[in-house]
Amino acid sequence: MAGRWLDPLWAPGFLCVALILETASGAGDLSTKAHGHIQFSARGVNQTAMADCRAVCSLNTSDRCDFVKRNPDCHSEGGYLDYLKGIFCYFPPNLLPLAITLYVFWLLYLFLILGVTAAKFFCPNLSAISTSLKLSHNVAGVTFLAFGNGAPDIFSALVAFSDPRTAGLAIGALFGAGVLVTTVVAGGITILRPFMAASRPFLRDITFYMVAVFLTFTALYLGRITLVWALGYLGLYVFYVVTVIICTWVYQRQRSRSLVHSISETPELLTDSEEDQMSSNTNSYDYGEEYRPLLLGEETTGQILLQALNPLDYRKWRTQSISCKLLKVAKLPVEFLLLLTVPVVDPDKDDRNWKRPLNCLQLVISPLVLVLTLQSGVYGIYEIGGLLPVWAVVVIVGTALASVTFFATSNSEPPRLHWLFAFLGFLTSALWINAAATEVVNILRSLGVVFRLSNTVLGLTLLAWGNSIGDAFSDFTLARQGYPRMAFSACFGGIIFNILVGVGLGCLLQIVRSHASEVKLEPDGLLVWVLASALGLSLVFSLVSVPLQCFQLSKAYGLCLLLFYICFIVVVLLTEFGVIHLKAD
């Protein structure tokens, strides 16, 4: 039996040894330092000589604040808060642990903001847009919904690539999330519920992902990403979308011709085509159920507004556990702010989630949020002709538009152009996610300065964990409910979008922004090769072992993946702290 070949416990050990050997040999010809981080720069852009900001911790406590203020390497490109200045200028040295603790709690809350915004506001509006454009489920699943599910990862990558000093976070987070999802999440699914994998979607997705990883590994080896290379990433994703559409069409055509008798639909008898369709919608959120009003019948404008702004469902509140209630309390301020600023269109409801007073109010507030979050509010405070700032003009125009809409519509029936609110909600939620992602990147960089950690290790641990934990819980829940194939398919489908669009679009925007011909990559540490090798080994292991098991995934396979991730983290930490290093020539 081919499946029994993988049962012995030496498989995880073999993977760990292979990871260490791949790390030592793959980077053996590189003249690099043992402890370092990826440095990115755009060719043709003047760069100011500066000291590494992480040197601040080696200075006297009285000199740290002045060093942070004067050193350009300690300044953030975007964001609303200066975290390094807060640590070294506003907190006394003896309260540094308190500052770090507060930053960690704020980081966790930012991850919560990212998750709530993406799940309850960004994804529903993308779904409404795809419905308005009459896209098929497969096209919507690999485009709009993939963008919605990967929004935190994508925006974190775009923000990180925008600053050469934090671009290592992007590579670390995208590769780190890839290792995490293909080992811990995929392995956890098979441990919770062993199942028969869908062969064609699995082979297709893992092949495309391996090509994407190989392209990124090659770019790191060459030390640059050109404009053509960045466009190639995006073109490869377009080719992936076309492949999914064609494969689905061919399969459905063959099925319609060869179908002789009907097959009863059970959770484990889903076809490959149905698996694709369902996995593309795994993370959609039924926001209408939670915010459904308690009162029925004719309601006044004031009642509609109050109920639309209420993020708490009292019926669910009474049945929730203490931990769920505490989490809900933490989310209430975020949900209220998002309900106030982000319109949501629901094509599945009779009224399409039309809330006349709230939607009219959002015509004023949402554009204001757009100009105040774009580039951290730089454009919002710009004065037009030296008379009025942009935000004031936006408020005036929005108020006029809201007044016309309010008096031209009714509470009971949505207007004919109500679907346009989905685009407004999409833009507003996207900029909220971008603003939160900017703060996440800045906090992680500040923690890296304090603990003298490279951006790469922060990206592959904290940033990757934070952005992937929501998808992990969703996939585990699907597996426990009897849909492991759907959850397993979602593991590989989502990370393809993240790496191709994250790297491609991030580098493309950096090239356009800096007016350079390429983005130069300078991996001066062994850690990035550990990361790339680990991801490649995990994919090769799955590509070989899954077909050998005849696509019948067992708990032993899941345990091998989990042990591999543990070995990977151990090797990463040993490399980061210089225990594993290259010998000097």
From Swiss-Prot:
Catalytic activity, reaction form: Ca(2+)(in) + 3 Na(+)(out) = Ca(2+)(out) + 3 Na(+)(in); 3 Li(+)(out) + Ca(2+)(in) = 3 Li(+)(in) + Ca(2+)(out)
Ranges of the Extracellular topological domain: 27-95, 162-168, 227, 347-360, 405-416, 467-491, 547-559
Transmembrane segments: 96-116, 141-161, 169-189, 206-226, 228-247, 326-346, 361-381, 384-404, 417-437, 446-466, 492-512, 526-546, 560-580
PTMs per UniProt: Phosphorylation at Ser-258 by PKA prevents calcium overload.
Residues modified as Phosphoserine: 258
Localization: Mitochondrion inner membrane
Official protein name in the record: Mitochondrial sodium/calcium exchanger protein
Species name: Rattus norvegicus
